[in-house]
Amino acid sequence: VIRFVTSASPKRVMAIGQKTEIIQYEINTYDSIQCIIEWEMLNGTKFTETILTSWIDPESSSAISDQKIKFIGTSGRYEADQKERGIRINTDNVGVLHINPDFCMPYGYNDGDIQWRGYGIDSITTFLNDVADLEDGLKNISDLQENRPSFKESLISTMVTDAAHKSLKNGSQWEEIKILK
């Protein structure tokens, strides 16, 4: 998401992990990993991202998974909460917005018709519309390459994940990332 929003490139990665719970079950993996990624924007500005990930959650948790993402910048903040199915944006220019708080919701009309809306539905219809436009010759792959997730772009997150894995193996050392053009 960071790459898609900022067009920045990851420069280096460092990860630290803990093995205390799962190892008791003779599974040699991390319970929790903290990862710091240094990014560089096209104008040379650098910033960091912190990722916290864990397999460990209380049995009493209200969801099978609890995923959140926050971008905190100089003039604003973006927060998405998978469990609550909500997105909150707070910027100096606009203030607080609670955008599309649910995955999908039914909207009723005066004629009794119901239409489902929300980012869950919208993402699927966008994909299907793109496929139809490709088939009809209204768009080509290069049109979508810049404004849709792509296999090419997925290589960036794969490189970050690989660098985090190497960092864990190398005593939490910084691992440089070389982006291929």
Give residue ranges: language-model regions.
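Contiguous beta-strand/loop segments that form the cofactor/metal-binding neighborhood of enzyme cores
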Residues: 1-93, 113, 122-139, 162-165, ...
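Active-site rim elements
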Residues: 20, 56, 110-115, 143-151
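Active-site loop of classical SDR/Rossmann-like NAD(P)-dependent oxidoreductases
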Residues: 114-125, 149-156
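Glycine- and charged-residue-rich phosphate/anionic-cofactor binding loop of Rossmann-like
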Residues: 137-156, 172, 176
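C-terminal accessory helical subdomains adjacent to catalytic cores in phosphodiester-
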Residues: 100-103, 149
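C-terminal hydrophobic helical "lid"/dimerization subdomain
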Residues: 154-166
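Short glycine/proline-rich turn/loop motifs
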Residues: 104-111, 135-145
